């Protein structure tokens, strides 16, 4: 591109590099759930403040005079991942050395990597304390760069299997209660199966029933494997963002269905789907409308939408660009074909160094997403050699 090029791209939700950590699975011989050595709560209900960034819920915690530490909550992961630095600070009985202490983990999109085993002596979330937590060690630097904030780990579903876990997306909080508590849970229960260490529920798609993973660690909305289903499309599949996974990157294919999705008593009309060849899943872009409660003692999940009205229609706002983020610059990783960005001549490899005049290091993902909610054009500054070129961008709906 030259400095005179017009760059009309997206306004709205950022089509950024999304790290799909959900769906992490262990080999079959390790699928028996391994809860922490002991879980204690300061009361019958522990409320942990949470934050939503890129459709992912994360929490912040401090204990033993150290922290704050930040963790993503990933119900789609059968393991808990932490950085080597955190494992060194709170070493447990399992140390990451010696034979047979590496495990192969398969990510949501089928790729696999080997990670060292270890354990944490203690992990606290507000008034909840977990002791002798088995973990795998993972470098969270790429995820930290994407979210624009330090990430110290990913909390998998088995960590909470001794608890009644509520992800209150609208209220930006986690609620932890004893699993034996006879609590009144809002919403309609959906039978669940956590035999493989992660929660699977049956949902309705049109006139069919479909088994899906409830995956808070996926930033997507509804990931659908169309094999054997022959879904009807209101808007046919098209290219979306470039998605980062635990084992690499893949291009996204998105579509809008012509039939509703039913979660218990909740009906989502014409849902947006991210097409996959792996297990179908409900991710953060859909779950964020609900208060989701996992009741492992009774094998059920509740979906409750606070307030009046039906679930809102799912939308996909896009800039036509995917970025790989660093504190100093954002590199264009991919351009969606047929988007305004592609028409403007933007190509992968170009570097963005400022947003609205501020260095990109000041823009975490949550702040950038809030900016994209508005209607005002956004000024991106590109670095071309030693020259800086400003471009004002707007946004479009990826799927009508």
Predicted segments — roles?
Residues 2-14:
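Bacterial N-terminal signal peptides that target proteins for export
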Residues 24-400:
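Pepsin/retropepsin-fold aspartyl endopeptidases
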């Amino acid at each position: 591109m030259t400095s005179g090029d017009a760059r009309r791209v997206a306004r709205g939700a950022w089509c950024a590099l999304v790290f799909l950590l959900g769906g992490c699975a262990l080999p079959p011989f390790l699928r028996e759930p391994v809860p922490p050595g002991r879980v204690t709560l300061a009361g019958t209900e522990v409320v942990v403040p949470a934050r939503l960034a890129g459709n992912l819920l994360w929490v912040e915690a401090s204990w033993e005079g150290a922290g704050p530490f930040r963790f993503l909550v990933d119900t789609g992961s059968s393991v808990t991942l932490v950085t080597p630095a955190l494992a060194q600070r709170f070493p447990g009985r399992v140390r990451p050395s010696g034979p047979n202490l590496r495990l192969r983990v398969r990510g949501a999109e089928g790729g696999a990597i080997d990670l060292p085993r270890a354990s944490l002596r203690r992990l606290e979330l507000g008034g909840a304390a977990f002791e002798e937590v088995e973990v795998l060690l993972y470098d969270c630097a790429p995820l930290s760069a994407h979210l624009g904030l330090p990430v110290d780990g990913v909390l998998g579903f088995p960590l909470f299997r001794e608890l009644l876990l509520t992800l209150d997306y609208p209220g930006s909080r986690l609620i932890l209660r004893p699993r034996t508590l006879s609590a009144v849970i809002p919403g309609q229960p959906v039978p669940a199966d956590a035999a493989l260490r992660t929660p699977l529920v049956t949902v309705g798609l049109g006139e069919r029933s479909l088994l899906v993973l409830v995956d808070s660690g996926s930033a997507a909305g509804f990931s659908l494997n169309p094999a054997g289903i022959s879904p009807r499309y209101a808007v046919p599949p098209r290219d979306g963002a470039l998605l980062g996974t635990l084992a690499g990157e893949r291009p996204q294919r998105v579509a809008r269905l012509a039939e509703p999705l039913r979660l218990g008593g909740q009906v989502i009309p014409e849902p947006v789907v991210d097409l996959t060849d792996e297990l179908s899943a409900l991710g953060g872009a859909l779950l964020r409308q609900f208060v989701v409660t996992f009741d492992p003692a009774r094998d059920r999940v509740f979906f409750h939408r606070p307030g009046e009205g039906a679930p809102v229609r799912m939308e996909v706002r896009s800039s036509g660009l995917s970025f790989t983020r660093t504190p100093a610059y954002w590199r264009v990783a991919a351009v969606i074909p047929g988007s305004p960005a592609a028409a403007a001549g933007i190509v992968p490899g170009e570097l963005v160094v400022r947003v609205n005049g501020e260095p990109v290091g000041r823009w975490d993902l949550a702040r950038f997403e809030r900016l994209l909610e508005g209607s005002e054009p956004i000024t991106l500054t590109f670095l071309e050699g030693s020259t800086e070129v400003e471009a004002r961008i707007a946004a479009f709906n990826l799927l009508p």
